[in-house]
Amino acid sequence: GLGDVYKRQGVGNIPNAVLDGLLHSDLEHLTSYTEVIQDGMIDLIDAGKLDVASATAFSLSPDYAHKMNENAAFYRDHIILRPQEISNHPEVIRRLGVIGANGMIEADIYGNVNSTHVMGSRMMNGIGGSGDFTRNAYISAFVSPSTAKNGAISAIVPMVSHVAVSYTH
């Protein structure tokens, strides 16, 4: 298994698809060190694939929030909540060797990534830990559908409308 590999999962449709892929894989004894716990991580815990998830917050649908409240004693053994200053701390992320998968809205040909704003001004996602995890993870990637609005808008653009992370090395 990958028990010693710490995974950081971003928020969004592609990161959720990755969680679903893990659910249907042969991998087990996973550990997640991330900022936000979402529905897919609860499914992994329920399936016995995710041993523990460490995060700062929850972003759950109403059904999953209810499920967690109803089974709090069970989830208490699998979830650790930490202050943001610890969960996003560069030294901790590096030491654990986190593999990061962050969602993005758009990326440009210069290596800049916009993971927070639509059209440069409307906030879609919080600022979050994508910068912390991108800079400090052992392996870091941004994931996104290739297009939006039924193929009308490309996720790869000449210049992003808002720079959240510069991914050049």
Per-region residue spans from a language model:
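Short, small-residue-biased leader/transition segments that mark boundaries at the very start
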Residues: 2-6, 169
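Short acidic, glycine/serine/threonine-rich loops at helix termini
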Residues: 18-23, 43-46, 93, 112-119, ...
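A glycine- and small-aliphatic-rich helix-loop capping segment at beta-alpha/alpha-beta transitions
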Residues: 23-29, 119-124
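Ligand-binding beta-strand-loop-alpha-helix segment within the catalytic cores
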Residues: 37, 41-107
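C-terminal catalytic subdomain
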Residues: 97-167
